[in-house]
Amino acid sequence: MVLDAAADLTEVPGAGRTRIVVAGAPPPTRTIERVETELGWEFIQIYGLTETAPLLTMNRGRAEWDHLDPSERARRLSRAGAPALGVRMGLTVQGELTARANQVMEGYWEQPEATADAIVDGWFRTGDGGTIDDEGYVTISDRKKDVIISGGENVSSIEVEDALFSHPAVAEVAVIGVPDEKWGELVLGLVVLVEGESVSEDELRDHCRPKLAGYKIPKRIEFRAELARTATGKLQKFKLRESYWEGFDRKVN
């Protein structure tokens, strides 16, 4: 909304002296690039949970990135960031991010079983899948509950969303798994188009091919007028999945 409103302004307020801090679901790379190039605002991303009080990592542009192409700089800023002071980040064998720090909770109030599931050998299990690169930067691949399992392969909905959103005709996108007799789950893209723009399913799939492995490309794409969101604008994927999973036991993915 801010980016769209700024298009009608002759001068963007705070250009060159404003910082925008983003937390929650990782934003699309194209959005990060637009914030920095069109608004002139510094983009900072942080990651954490209520149980970690809340900061675990932070990603702020570094001086050595200043010479980079805006798209490459945005790609680096799309990572969740490096561990904050006093925080250690790790990974389980299954690829779930774990954290250890003084500010991590001791446990859930009067819920010993939930506490035992969440904290193992002193490490808090975040419920987020991810990676840690050679620089120590954390990248969130997906919430465990949002990972799509298609033909035995794990598909990150965030990765597919980023590929679809990079098409200029796409205004909003959500990617979910829906039941399929052959593959278990199919990758479904729900897309809201920019007003006045048009694009076909095949054109969007072709756009994704250089960016995604073949099994990650959405088998189906549906166009919507809007997507279910919370009051703060976060996608409600459980609501988007509901109608597709009626009559099936598994409704998480």
Model-derived features: positions:
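Hydrophobic/anchoring residues in structured secondary elements
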Residues: 22, 175, 222-223
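Short, conserved loop/helix-junction motifs that constitute active-site signature segments
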Residues: 9-16
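Conserved AMP-binding/adenylate-forming
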Residues: 18-23, 27-46, 50-138, 143-147, ...
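AMP-binding/adenylate-forming catalytic core of the ANL superfamily
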Residues: 101, 106-107, 117, 129-216, ...
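Acidic/polar alpha-helix N-cap and adjacent early helical turns
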Residues: 242-253
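Residue-level signal for well-ordered alpha-helical positions
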Residues: 5-6, 111, 151
